[in-house]
């Protein structure tokens, strides 16, 4: 028979192992996103479990977000890891987009009030665990509060832009 404290120690060890296992499995699943079997509308592309569409008619950030919300579960695109960033980069480059910037769902609704750029978030409320700034928006002299992909970085890195500028945009939505 085990002493009463042994059960709580063993329970704690088991819980710790299970938590560690789930974290490790989660990391592997991000690296190998299975190709989704979803049907996306004409003019959009599937990646993971979402559809992505680039719209070339320029809109302000807010109007682009509203346009994306007309699609099921739609918002301006959130870029959650480097694999998704690479997918978006090649998608935007393939279209022959002539603009220097393209809207994504990144914005700072606090207008810089949070220290160290802490106010930036995705329009669909996805958690920001991946960062890929072309320049640090909290230290720039000409700070702006809406996010875009930058042509100078091959559409891989993010740049803060004035929200009222009209740019092409990428929507991410369910198929």
Swiss-Prot record:
Source domain of life: Eukaryota
Database matches in CDD domains: CLECT_REG-1_like
The record's account of how the chain is modified after translation: Proteolytic processing by trypsin removes an inhibitory N-terminal propeptide and is essential for peptidoglycan binding and antibacterial activity.
Compartments, as annotated in UniProt: Secreted
Motif EPN: chain residues: 114-116
One GO cellular component term: extracellular region
Key word Thylakoid present: no
Record InterPro entries: C-type_lectin-like, C-type_lectin-like/link_sf, C-type_lectin/snaclec_domain, C-type_lectin_CS, CTDL_fold
Illness association: Overexpressed during the acute phase of pancreatitis.
Annotated protein name in UniProt: Regenerating islet-derived protein 3-beta
Organism, as annotated: Mus musculus (Mouse)
Name of the coding gene: Reg3b
């Amino acid at each position: 028979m085990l002493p009463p404290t042994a059960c709580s120690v063993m329970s704690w060890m088991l819980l710790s192992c299970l938590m560690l296992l789930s974290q490790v499995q989660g990391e592997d699943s991000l690296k190998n996103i299975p190709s989704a079997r979803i049907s996306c509308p004409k003019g959009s592309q599937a990646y993971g479990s979402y559809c992505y569409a680039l719209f070339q008619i320029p809109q302000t950030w807010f109007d682009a977000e509203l346009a994306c919300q007309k699609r099921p579960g739609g918002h301006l695109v959130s870029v959650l890891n480097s694999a998704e960033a690479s997918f978006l980069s090649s998608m935007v480059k393939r279209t022959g987009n002539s603009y220097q910037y393209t809207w994504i769902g990144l914005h700072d609704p606090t207008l810089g009030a949070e220290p160290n750029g802490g106010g930036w978030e995705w329009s669909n409320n996805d958690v920001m665990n991946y960062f890929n700034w072309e320049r640090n928006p909290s230290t720039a002299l000409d700070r702006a509060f809406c996010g875009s992909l930058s042509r100078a970085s091959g559409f891989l890195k993010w740049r803060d832009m004035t929200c009222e500028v009209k740019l092409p945009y990428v929507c991410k939505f369910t198929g």
